Amino acid sequence: MKKTIALILTIAMAVATLTGCAGTTVVIGECTCPCVTEDSAVAPETTPAATEAAPEVAAPETASGALKTGLAVSTNISKSVSATAEAAGAVEYDVTLAAVTVDDNGVIQSCVIDSIPATVNFDNKGVITSDITAAVDTKNEKGEAYGMVAWGGAIAEWDAQVAAVADYAVGKTVEELKNGDIDMTTGKAKDGSDLSSSATIYLAGYVYAIEAAVNNAQHLGAQSGDELVLATMNGVKSSASATAEAAGLAQLDADIAVLTRKDGVITSCYIDSLQAKVNFDVTGTITTDLAAPVQTKNELGEAYGMVAWGGAIAEWDEQAASFARYITGKTAADVAGIAITETTKPADGSDLASSVTISIGGFQALIAKAMQ
């Protein structure tokens, strides 16, 4: 099975569906979770709250102990700057991810939070100076290398601090979370609170992300006691320098899966993808509205245009939901063994091919990573 999963991960590097330069996998059982810095955690007043528009899926019948699975994605590009003669231009991405399981009373049962930081630099001629083939690690994946302790003298590294916040959220409703140890005015843990001893970074943005994930949660098959996993594959290799014929492009591709599992079997799954594009011209001037919301493919829905412009049998969000539903109840080996064509589309005549016609090799790689 390990050889098969390794093969699928290799295939993903060549598949356009999911970019996959780097990423992370976080697993939560009774919630030992990872969570944003003050820069990336922005309240809804300044950055649109993460409103992950969940595609319509046929949810399994609920049963005693049934939980809802939710994901929220919020992207901030407001710190991006144009190039000048004195300083390079930079498109700065900070993507906050929150995943939860929640019961029908709104009580959070498990929580994972992560963040994807990425930067694409370019000069005042619109030429990219960054290595766009370099890995794009999440903050949890960076761990100590993120440098909050070494360079900032923090009491703990970013991943440890956000893990404390995610742990704190478990067993609470959103309202209880907002009215507990976190001062939603200052955004910090209240002085003297238990949380203040383990988390000193700005936290309010993470609370908003958790709230969005709870609001987006739906019954997809998760049960009490299942492990919650958040996995990503990220890259900026689609970026391109500006020319006389075409605008420059900084593009962060982030492919995201949240799933629950028990005894090696997927019990619920939700997949989304982000293509965050910022254009600049041959003078290094950014031409994209940095205040405009950056939506995921699920949030775009019909506006993504696969049906209208490509004549697809269904929109991207519907096909991703169909794939997620299809693999629920399967093991990692089952998913890796799904029959595909040379272009990694579902094999002709298969059950999956009737609802999914996009390439799924990247999906398989993402799930393989989540199930490691």
Model-derived features: positions:
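Positively charged n-region of N-terminal signal peptides that target proteins for export
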Residues: 1-11
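Generic cytosolic/nucleocytoplasmic N-terminal low-complexity/intrinsically disordered segments
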Residues: 1-2, 44, 138, 296
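Intrinsically disordered, low-complexity segments enriched in glycine/proline and serine/threonine
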Residues: 5-6, 41, 48, 55, ...
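C-terminal motif of bacterial Sec signal peptides marking the signal peptidase cleavage site
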Residues: 16-20
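Bacterial signal peptide processing site
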Residues: 22-24
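N-terminal, intrinsically disordered, polar/charged segments of Gram-positive cell-envelope systems
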Residues: 26-64
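Active-site- and interface-proximal helix/loop "cap" or "latch" segments in soluble metabolic
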Residues: 63-372
